[in-house]
Amino acid sequence: FGFRPGMTDFQAVEAARIGGLPLGCHAVLAVGDAPGLASPSGRHLTLGLPASFNICHWGANICRSGWMVRSADELPVAARDYVEAFAAPYVQAMSDWCALMRPGVVGGAVWRDMMRALPFDRFGVTLNPGHLIGLDEWVSSPIREGSTDVLASGMAMQMDVIPGHAVYGSTRMEDGYVIADSDLRATLARDYPNVARRCDARARFMREVIGMDVPETLLPLADTCGIVAPFLFDPAQVLIC
C-alpha cells in the first residue's frame, strides 16, 4: 500500500502502477462520502476518512475498503470498535465463504450461509455474495437466494461480498479464485507448474498464517488473497481468524 496522508487520490492510483494491462472495469478510489464506484477526482487522503479502492485486470478484481488511519484511536469515536464489531466478523465470514467453494455446492446454500454469518442489520449486504468473473468484472452469479445452480470445477469466482454500515463504513477482502477439482489441479500442475505453485503457496499462507478454511478445491489468484488491513495508513496490521 502506498497511501500517505495528504496525497491526492490521483497520486495514490499512480502508485498502483497499473502498467497498461487490460482492465475488466475502471479503477476505483472512493474517499470519504464519494460514491462507491467513484474514480479519482483530486480529493486528498485525509486522516479519519473511510476509503475503498480496486484494480481489476481481466479475470480478477482486487478491492479493499477500510479507514485512512493508523490505529483505532484515530477512528471517529462511534467507530472505535470497527475491528471487533465489523471487520473481524467479516474476515471470519470470508473464511466460511472459502470453505464453501467446492464442486457440487449449491449457490443458494452459499447465499444462506453468508446471510447468516453477516446479519443484514449490521452488515447490509445486498448484492450477490460472490459471482463469476471473466473479461468483464461481473458476469453472472450462481450465488443468490434460492439458487439451485451448482458450483463447478473451472468456475472463476470473485470473492465479492460488500458490507456497508452508516457508522463503520465498509471492509473488503475481494480477490479472484478458481474452483478446481483434482483433474483440473493436475492439469494445471502439468501445464503451468509455476502458476500451480503460486496458488498452492498462497492457499497455505491463508490457512497457516491467516487461519482461513481454504479447501484444496479453491485456487487463490493473487498475493493479496486473505489480507484485510483495516487501517490503511498502517497496512502491516492485518486481521487473522
Model-derived features with residue positions:
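Active-site neighborhoods and metal-handling regions in enzymes and metal-associated proteins
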Residues: 1-241
